Amino acid sequence: LSCASCENAACPAIGLPCKPSEYVYTPCGCCPQCPLELGQPCGSFTQRCQFDLWCLRRKGNKIEAYKYVPWHLDFKGVCARVDV
């Protein structure tokens, strides 16, 4: 992943209505977006899930969950609640 300067970023319109205090940012950190909701697909190159959710996937008998999915992983999951 190579990030250009945010000065020239063409940010997409913010999707679902959310408060500015809830904004999360695209992987390069330039564009504010609303966080993903329960059940929405998430991964390395999406915005984060809502603050009380994790990006989760099942892999065989194992469950992997990330609060902040590292950009360098090939990770695709679904926003879900996780009891730790």
From Swiss-Prot:
Annotated keywords: Disulfide bond, Growth factor binding
Disulphide bridges, residue numbers: 3-28, 6-30, 11-31, 18-34, 42-55, 49-79
PROSITE patterns reported in the protein's UniProt record: IGFBP_N_1, IGFBP_N_2
Pfam families membership: IGFBP
IGFBP N-terminal domain location: 1-82
Gene3D superfamilies: 4.10.40.20
Keyword Disulfide bond listed: yes
An annotated GO cellular component: extracellular region
Tissue: Shell.
The keyword Disulfide bond appears for this protein: yes
UniProt GO molecular function: growth factor binding
Protein purpose: Binds human IGF1 and IGF2 and bovine insulin.
Entry protein name: Perlustrin
